[in-house]
Swiss-Prot record:
InterPro entries: MeTrfase_TrmA_AS, MeTrfase_TrmA_CS, NA-bd_OB-fold, SAM-dependent_MTases_sf, TRAM_dom, U5_MeTrfase_fam. Residues 5-63 form the TRAM domain. Signal peptide: none annotated. The active site is at C415. This is Uncharacterized RNA methyltransferase lin1815. Belongs to the class I-like SAM-binding methyltransferase superfamily. RNA M5U methyltransferase family. The keyword rRNA-binding does not apply. It is an enzyme of class 2 (transferase). Its EC number is 2.1.1.-. [4Fe-4S] cluster binds at C76, C82, C85, C166. It comes from Listeria innocua serovar 6a (strain ATCC BAA-680 / CLIP 11262). GO terms for biological process: rRNA base methylation. S-adenosyl-L-methionine binds at Q290, Y319, D340, D388.
Amino acid sequence: MNQNPVEEGQKFPLTIRRMGINGEGIGYFKKAVVFVPGAITGEEVVVEAVKVRDRFTEAKLNKIRKKSPNRVTAPCPVYEACGGCQLQHVAYNAQLELKRDIVIQSIEKHTKIDPAKLKIRPTIGMEDPWRYRNKSQFQTRMVGSGQVETGLFGANSHQLVPIEDCIVQQPVTIKVTNFVRDLLEKYGVPIYDEKAGSGIIRTIVVRTGVKTGETQLVFITNSKKLPKKREMLAEIEAALPEVTSIMQNVNQAKSSLIFGDETFLLAGKESIEEKLMELEFDLSARAFFQLNPFQTERLYQEVEKALVLTGSETLVDAYCGVGTIGQAFAGKVKEVRGMDIIPESIEDAKRNAEKNGIDNVYYEVGKAEDVLPKWVKEGFRPDAVIVDPPRSGCDQGLIKSLLQVEAKQLVYVSCNPSTLARDLALLAKKYQIRYMQPVDMFPQTAHVETVTLLQRR
């Protein structure tokens, strides 16, 4: 029996009490929870129920009766349609406060820990919270009689929203994407049709090295074929000298994953170079690298502050990617070991260590939950561990290993407060949470990065 007093299509007044982990407003109607995208804490609004469930209602914002002083006009023309950003309508200082609150909400929801007893610091923000993303992944679509559009899927849909400019992207990523889009249209290159499973071009991926100016273009295709390849490469070379690497990645899977397993060089170099904390890093097409290079240095500074190192420690860099975090600390410890499941990332990490003159690092391809126990069996025990997992959080096998290893210091770098809280609840058996430091890596969105210091009990 439906206990929810709200009916679909019903319109009713609501006071927004709080904002949720996805940036939506939360209010209560006859004690039932109502989620309202676009509403801000303290606002009095009129909403319309669009989805009614037993325990909650999703509603759309119809009218604002009392506006929050933190409400601003979103500068992006496709903000409400796109779904890539959730907080452009919120003043930036209020965004930072919300992100700290998102961490608190996650602790409340997923653990029995009282967040009031934790030291959760104010969020570290950006001076200029725009144009920060160094990588774009724009889907393609054919419309009308041969017109090609590029953009992002709308929130919770597979409807492409065409985007001419994205104001959180580095300008060069948009410039290259738009140029390639026009080339695809000019030469009539077949665009992938998701429903039919036909066509070739699925996605245009562009990544730039902000400090080096080197830019990589990746054609994500449905087959190894790339019609008009020679003509397009010639035009790109002539018009876009900043593009120093052009790759093709083949993804024939019917899934939402961007990349497939097969990548090959079309022109230029296999990778681009980026600089971070006075180190140089090669980035291949599939390798993970933080999307906001400006805040990445702030993030790593917070990791550095968290760890107490004398120079005699062994350090594990789990989910190491191209080796950025571990190599930033290599000069402060006896040995760094890192692992990652993407072979190209490990190749990049090894090459980066050589390039940076670092010889006390060791890298291995594999899952962190498999590799760490293997190392322990071989007699290696880390004094400190840094984990920087994907949004899904740490694998339960890795959590088990971390509890067995009992490293003196554990720094958890998280991009998802919900999975962070879930993992902290388990790690709390052997580790004490010293503090949590939110860092705003993705301004204008509801995403928050958190550096958490844990010490062995």
